[in-house]
């Protein structure tokens, strides 16, 4: 603490300049100053380059000639030179300024390959060997050195020496002969039998091989250049085609927008008319409501009296409730007091328990400290014993050395004893010779005594040697015990080491497998994400297409609200007959071509309205292959229908020609514009797509005044329609291949626009021949059966049902999607119930069609007979009533459709939830695997620690127990944190999924609001 306070005081005393100088001096002393400068310069350059990269500033454009490869090679040469020479500052500035990265620096082999130096050449080898040997010099220095040596070797020679002596010759011929002789001597002598032709053939072969190699190289170069040219031309062609396609698409979009604007204007006018009618109805309802208000006021007076009585009863009940609530409050207060007492008790118990745990912890820690102290004392004692054993070993070594010395002394004593015995023999001989026996005996006795002493000393030394040898042979018991323990410990360590290596290898394999598996799972997750994104984009596109089709169909329904009267003829068309059955054809039907034209126009339009269902069928995510198959089947069906229509049109044309001669009224009818419009809409589905022009031709045709001219126009128009039908069928036969999605959507929109224009191009009567009718009459006369009338919708729905039955081979998901589409389209089907109600009301559905023919013929004959106008007014009233019923039914159908759409959205939500659940499962499995890997690593660390503890012979069960408890606590904390992470990830995923579902639901509601 004192040192820290001193440091703070010193820092407070120092000024900024002094601190700066001190820092500078410390950096300079440590040798960090240069590196800091280079780092700061590098960072400054990067910061200055950053606004250039973001687009704020424009860098100076330096005109550099040559390719980027050569620039990179030269930059890498300079960088290598700066690095080898140790110019760190200039290198740190050069890297960011040149835009060169450390990973992108060319190697020496790359540079040599770029300079096109042959790897087999001596220059290449010398450069490579020189770079390996001379690490200090760079590639640039070595290369320049080699170039200098190469040019020095090729210097011109000023002095020459002549080795061969030339003799003076007089003539030039002799000199040439001498040169030929020298060449003949120098040239190697070949076999005499070898001819000149063989040599020439060899030269020819060599030259041909060289020419072939050169030709092959030239051909390769020519092929590469030609292929590049072809690719460039193909790119230019594709770009031109793209621009053409974009221009056509823009024109089509402009035409569509204009048509939509016209439709919007017409719908606004109808809405204004509808609002005026509604205001009148509201006024009548208001008067009725005023009468009802008077009645209600009387009832209110009665109700007030009842309410007063009820209020009195209610006050009594409130007083009872108040008393009950007061009792409940008292009970709640008592319960709160009980809870507070219990909470206090719990807190006290928890405090006691915590104190006990702390005491236990302190006791355990004290025990552990004592155990550690005892272990240390034992270790000190063991060390002392080891020191004593070592000292005993040293004593043993000393005793062994002493035994060896004693053995040497014994050998010397033996030699002395032998010498003494010899001396004794010599002395005995002398004694025999000499006469002094007494002196000799005394000397003998002394020598014997000395011998005995020496023998005793020898025996004692031998005994000591034996005892010492026994002690050396038998080691100490403590040493034996320690040796046994050491052997056991070494064996255990070897076994544990082998087990550890096996476990480590197995865990390493598991880790690699898990890593590979996790990589695969990540790739699958990325694939799932990409598929989900693509599916969401497809769903959004398909919803937009659905919205457009709904708006178009509803606009057509609003444009032409009148129902068709001829129900039996359309039922015959639904069953597959082009012309009504023979039993249902009456004389009026045959004599009135206007009715026949209406029937054929409806039949053609009903066949056309089948096509936009491709959008609805393509609403499933995996519907590309199905759509291809459906389009092929649809093309075949359209070809068959085109053939049937050709036959039907021919038969109809013959009947019209026959009936025109019989009935004079048929000539007065207006031209068959409905039929022509229907046929033109059919021909508009050909690949040329001449929709707009043909519709305009129909809408802008001048009406002819005379009857003969009208008949000619009818015949000409019907003939042109038949020829166009043939052209459309032929083009359809050719275009059997399926179109892409963009073309499908465009074609379906073009169909809808063509149908809408056919309604706009309805005929108006000629002012010269016929009088102008009343507004109600004109409405009825102009409300000829439209393209999207209910019987034709029945035809479309019947065909869709048959197609769905044919498509039963597909998956259940697609079946559900098709069912939803059928339910969505069934809202339009019930619009065809009005003709059936009319039949039930007054028309006979049996064989004679006279009433139906009369009702249909009333449209053109209304200009001549005033009695028919009254019938039309009555029919109008009936139709208005039926319209009101239809509005109610439509509302019910809209509710059903909304419920169906909600079901579809719920299914989509379920699918999204399934996808998110799968994603969560994958993430959880990955997290579990990561946990397992962490646990395995912890186990490895534990095993290492245990081995270390065993090797140190200081195992303590309490320490192990405490370590295990700490590890368990760490694992629990890690598990809790991972669980929290998983929960947060799941919450984020659920929020994302809910947002996506809400966006989908919002999109669907917006679609519904826009559609109505």
From Swiss-Prot:
The post-translation modification note in this UniProt entry reads: Phosphorylated. Phosphorylation at Ser-735, by the cAMP-dependent protein kinase PKA, triggers ubiquitination and proteasomal degradation of OFD1. Also increases its interaction with TBC1D31 and regulates its function in ciliogenesis. Ubiquitinated by PJA2, upon phosphorylation at Ser-735 by PKA, leads to the proteasomal degradation of OFD1.
GO process terms (BP):
axoneme assembly; cilium assembly; embryonic body morphogenesis; epithelial cilium movement involved in determination of left/right asymmetry; negative regulation of fibroblast growth factor receptor signaling pathway involved in neural plate anterior/posterior pattern formation
Molecular function (Gene Ontology), one example:
identical protein binding
Renumbered to this chain, region (Mediates homooligomerization) spans 609-665
Q: Where's the LisH domain? A: 70-102
According to the record, mutating residue 735 to A results in: Loss of phosphorylation by PKA. Loss of cAMP-dependent interaction with TBC1D31. Loss of ubiquitin-mediated proteasomal degradation. Loss of function in cilium assembly. Dominant negative effect
UniProt biased composition (Basic and acidic residues): 871-904, 973-982
Tissues in which the UniProt entry reports expression: Widely expressed. Expressed in 9 and 14 weeks old embryos in metanephric mesenchyme, oral mucosa, lung, heart, nasal and cranial cartilage, and brain. Expressed in metanephros, brain, tongue, and limb.
| Sequence ranges of Low complexity compositional bias | 720-737
The subunit structure is: Homooligomer. Interacts with LCA5. Interacts with RUVBL1; the interaction is direct and may mediate interaction with the NuA4 histone acetyltransferase complex. Interacts with SDCCAG8; the interaction is direct. Interacts with MAP1LC3B. Interacts with C2CD3; OFD1 may act as a negative regulator of C2CD3. Forms a complex with KIAA0753/OFIP and CEP20/FOR20; the interaction with CEP20 is detected only in the presence of KIAA0753. Interacts with PCM1; this interaction may be mediated by KIAA0753/OFIP. Interacts with TBC1D31; regulates OFD1 activity in cilium assembly.
Task: Give the record's family classification.
Answer: Belongs to the OFD1 family.
Q: What name does the UniProt record give this protein?
A: Centriole and centriolar satellite protein OFD1
Give the source species.
Homo sapiens
């Amino acid at each position: 603490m004192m040192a820290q306070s001193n440091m703070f005081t010193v820092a407070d005393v120092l000024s900024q300049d002094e601190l700066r100088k001190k820092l500078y001096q410390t950096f300079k002393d440590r040798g960090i100053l240069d590196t800091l400068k280079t780092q700061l310069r590098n960072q400054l350059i990067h910061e200055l380059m950053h606004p250039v990269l973001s687009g704020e500033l424009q860098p100076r454009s330096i005109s550099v000639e040559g390719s980027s490869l050569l620039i990179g090679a030269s930059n890498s040469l300079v960088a290598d030179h700066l690095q080898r020479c140790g110019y760190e500052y200039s290198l740190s500035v050069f890297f960011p300024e040149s835009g060169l990265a450390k990973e992108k620096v060319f190697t020496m082999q790359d540079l040599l390959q770029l300079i096109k130096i042959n790897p087999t050449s001596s220059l290449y080898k010398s450069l490579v060997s020189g770079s390996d040997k001379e690490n200090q010099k760079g590639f640039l220095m070595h290369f320049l050195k080699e170039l200098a040596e190469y040019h020095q070797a090729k210097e011109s020679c000023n002095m020459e020496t002549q080795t061969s002596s030339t003799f003076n010759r007089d003539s030039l011929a002799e000199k040439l002969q001498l040169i030929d002789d020298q060449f003949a001597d120098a040239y190697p002598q070949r076999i005499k039998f070898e001819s000149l032709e063989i040599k020439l053939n060899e030269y020819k072969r060599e030259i041909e091989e060289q020419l072939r190699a050169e030709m092959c190289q030239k051909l390769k170069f020519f092929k590469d250049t030609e292929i590049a040219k072809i690719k460039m031309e193909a790119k230019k062609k594709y770009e031109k085609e793209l621009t053409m396609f974009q221009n056509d698409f823009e024109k089509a979009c402009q035409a569509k927008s204009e048509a939509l604007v016209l439709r919007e204007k017409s719908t606004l006018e109808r809405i204004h008319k509808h609002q005026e009618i509604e205001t009148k109805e509201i006024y009548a309802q208001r008067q009725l409501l005023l009468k009802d208000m008077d009645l209600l006021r009387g009832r209110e007076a009665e109700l007030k009296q009842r309410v007063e009585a009820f209020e009195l009863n209610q006050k009594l009940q409130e007083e009872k409730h108040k008393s009950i609530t007061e009792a409940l409050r008292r009970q709640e207060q008592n319960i709160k007091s009980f809870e507070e007492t219990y909470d206090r008790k719990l807190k006290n118990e928890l405090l006691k328990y915590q104190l006990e745990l702390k005491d236990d912890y302190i006791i355990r820690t004290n025990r552990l400290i004592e155990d550690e102290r005892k272990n240390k004392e034992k270790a000190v004692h063991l060390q002392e014993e080891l020191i004593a054993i070592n000292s005993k070993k040293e004593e043993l070594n000393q005793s062994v050395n002493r035994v060896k010395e004693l053995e040497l002394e014994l050998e010397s004593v033996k030699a002395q004893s032998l010498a003494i015995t010899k001396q004794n023999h010599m002395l005995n001989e002398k004694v025999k010779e000499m006469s002094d026996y007494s002196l000799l005996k005394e000397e003998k006795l002394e020598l014997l005594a000395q011998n005995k002493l020496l023998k005793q000393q020898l025996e004692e030394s031998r005994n000591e040697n034996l005892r010492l040898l026994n002690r050396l042979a038998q080691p100490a018991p403590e040493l034996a015990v320690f040796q046994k323990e050491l052997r056991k410990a070494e064996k255990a360590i070897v076994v544990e080491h082998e087990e550890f290596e096996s476990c480590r290898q197995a865990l390493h394999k598991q880790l690699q497998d898990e890593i590979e598996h996790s990589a695969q799972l990540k790739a699958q997750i990325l694939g799932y994400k990409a598929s989900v994104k693509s599916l969401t984009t497809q769903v959004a596109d398909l919803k937009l297409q659905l919205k457009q089709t709904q708006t178009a169909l509803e606009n057509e329904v609003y444009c032409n609200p009148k129902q068709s009267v001829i129900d039996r003829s359309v039922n015959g068309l639904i069953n597959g007959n082009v012309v009504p059955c023979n039993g249902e054809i009456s004389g009026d039907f045959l004599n009135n071509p206007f009715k026949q034209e209406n029937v054929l126009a409806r039949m053609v339009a009903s066949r056309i309205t089948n096509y936009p269902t491709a959008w609805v069928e393509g609403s499933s995510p995996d519907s590309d292959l199905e759509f291809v198959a459906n389009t092929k089947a649809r093309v075949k069906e359209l070809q068959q229908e085109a053939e049937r229509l050709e036959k039907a049109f021919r038969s109809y044309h013959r009947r019209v020609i026959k009936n025109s001669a019989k009935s004079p009224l048929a000539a007065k009818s207006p031209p068959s514009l409905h039929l022509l419009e229907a046929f033109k809409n059919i021909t508009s589905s050909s690949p040329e797509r001449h929709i707009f022009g043909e519709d305009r031709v129909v809408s802008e045709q001048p009406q002819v005044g005379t009857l003969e001219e009208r008949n000619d126009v009818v015949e000409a128009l019907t003939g042109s329609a038949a020829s166009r039908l043939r052209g459309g069928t032929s083009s359809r036969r050719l275009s059997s291949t399926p179109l892409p999605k963009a073309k499908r959507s465009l074609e379906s929109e073009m169909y809808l626009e063509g149908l809408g224009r056919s309604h706009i191009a309805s005929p108006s009567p000629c002012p010269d021949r016929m009088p102008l009718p009343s507004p109600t009459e004109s409405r009825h006369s102009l409300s000829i059966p439209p393209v999207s009338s209910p019987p034709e919708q029945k035809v479309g729905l019947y065909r869709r049902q048959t197609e769905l039955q044919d498509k039963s081979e597909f998956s259940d998901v697609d079946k559900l999607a098709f069912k939803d589409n059928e339910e969505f389209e069934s809202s339009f089907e019930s619009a065809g119930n009005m003709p059936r109600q009319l039949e039930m009301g007054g028309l006979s559905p049996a064989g004679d069609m006279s009433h139906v023919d009369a009702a249909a013929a009333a449209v053109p004959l209304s200009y001549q007979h005033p009695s028919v106008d009254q019938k039309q007014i009555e029919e109008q009233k009936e139709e208005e009533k039926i319209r009101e019923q239809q509005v109610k039914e439509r509302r019910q159908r809209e509710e059903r459709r909304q419920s169906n759409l909600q079901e579809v959205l719920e299914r989509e939500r379920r699918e999204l939830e399934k996808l998110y659940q799968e994603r969560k499962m994958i993430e959880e499995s990955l997290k579990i695997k990561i946990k397992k890997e962490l646990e395995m690593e912890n186990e490895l660390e534990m095993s290492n620690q245990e081995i270390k503890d065993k090797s140190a012979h200081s195992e303590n069960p309490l320490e192990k127990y405490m370590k295990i408890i700490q590890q368990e606590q760490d694992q629990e904390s890690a598990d809790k944190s991972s669980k929290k992470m998983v929960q947060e990830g799941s919450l984020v995923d659920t929020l994302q999924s809910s947002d996506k579902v809400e966006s989908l639901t919002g999109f669907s509601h917006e679609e519904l609001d826009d559609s109505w």
